[in-house]
Amino acid sequence: MPVDLGQALGPLPFLAKAEDATFSASDATQQRELANPETARQLFRQFRYQVLSGPQETLRQLRKLCFQWLRPEVHTKEQILELLMLEQFLTILPGEIQMWVRKQCPGSGQEAVTLVESLKGEPQKLWHWISTQVLGQEIPFEKENLTHCPGDKLEPALEVEPSLEVAPQDLPLQNSSSATGELLSHGVKEESDMEPELALAASQLPARPEERPVRDQELGTAVLPPLQEEQWRHLDSTQKEQYWDLMLETYGKMVSGVAGISNSKPDLTNLAEYGEELVGLHLHGAEKMARLPCKEDRQENDKENLNLENHRDQGCLDVFCQASGEAPPQTALSDFFGESEPHRFGGDSVPEALENHQGEGTGAHLFPYERGSGKQPGQHIQSSSLGELTALWLEEKREASQKGQARSPMAQKLPTCRECGKTFYRNSQLVFHQRTHTGETYFHCHICKKAFLRSSDFVKHQRTHTGEKPCKCDYCGKGFSDFSGLRHHEKIHTGEKPYKCPLCEKSFIQRSNFNRHQRVHTGEKPYKCTHCGKQFSWSSSLDKHQRSHLGKMPCP
């Protein structure tokens, strides 16, 4: 079954109508569009949850779109499985290869694998297709010496499926001077404060000079607009690298726009109107990355959802995919925090930094170092997932505490004892702890006049006077005044000895007996006579010794 450019290349312009479509039989035009499995697939993959519609209606529409795409009444289970596997395989391909393979319309996963493997022996085929099919540049076939696949076409115009007619107010973007330019940029906000070396004119379109000699020598002149070779020679290597990445991103934007908008191809010989919008976008193979803007005028319901399709071309997809549980669609986007341009990680928490990036729309770095983190601009932290970012954040906080820095604001607000500095989660815990310093007691026994801090201790003490033993052993029926005593007794019946000495492997039922046994190996003598200073390992030995000073019993 034919597969189009797919979800990784941006949302469809008629997506705004997809959620409210009723698919009535009276709308013949819309029925014809939805009869196309590829159109139904795009609608299914890019469908968004609407709070006003409710979960039941949303599930109904989603089920209908899924049936229109997979067509279970026509396809077998094996064919449906093959469609799903093909979709996932194409989704995880690098951006440039994915564009080319999708254009060949593979019918199965094996056909897609064959197309990808064909590029290994003939890498020029990909760049020839980009120049001829996407840019419309005329490159002599003999010069490229290519062997094309049966599905490889060399016509300068792309053949596209007919799309739904969308009114201007239904377009996903507003406030645009050029509707086509806005659709190509897929919601990328113009940046007025971009760095000078990144704000290059479209006429300075470079090819990579060192790493791709074949591509530069054979396609460098053809890719550049006319009469711009002189400007190209004056660019340094960094500018050429940056603009080559921008050019590849432009290809993806244009192919995505053509696949879902119309069959007209915009003239890219003058990219000045798209230059600022496309600066900062990242594609597979890019080693330099500028700022990653987010859409400023996003609808309110998009803030409640993680709309992956609107962020797919902005490099921040890995972070959102981690939150939503969906796998990153492209290998290129998984390198968002790559080695070539590691992003700065500031003092904000991960949720705060993510919220700032999603809501501000200022084009700032995802984790800017300027936000009170104390890090210098040159200090970078590399990461590839949200979990690694969290680990790095915790490591930063741990290092800060080791250096003697002040506690976090949250720790400063917790109840703290002024006497010993202990911190508690509740004020009630602090109040109870302070009684240990003041000696204040609330529970007094009227029989022996003993006082207790805890009510539980007071209740246990009263049972010594009343003889109450509410805790009964299930094995022998013996009663105990508290549950802890019952637990120790039950271990006699079960033979459980959880405390084992690592030196002599002797086991004990109670922790207290285990602690006393360890003194045999360590030689510890915690009990000291106040008269002569002699020390003992056991309290019973100290009692016998003290009697010798009182004259009751000679010292053993």
Curated annotation (Swiss-Prot):
GO terms for molecular function: DNA binding; zinc ion binding. It holds the Pfam family SCAN. It comes from the Eukaryota. Residues 218-291 form the KRAB domain. It is found in: Nucleus. One of its GO terms (cellular component) is nucleus. One of its GO terms (biological process) is regulation of DNA-templated transcription. The keyword Transcription applies. Keywords: DNA-binding, Metal-binding, Nucleus, Repeat, Transcription, Transcription regulation, Zinc, Zinc-finger. Belongs to the krueppel C2H2-type zinc-finger protein family. May be involved in transcriptional regulation. This is Zinc finger protein 18. It comes from Mus musculus. The gene is Znf18.
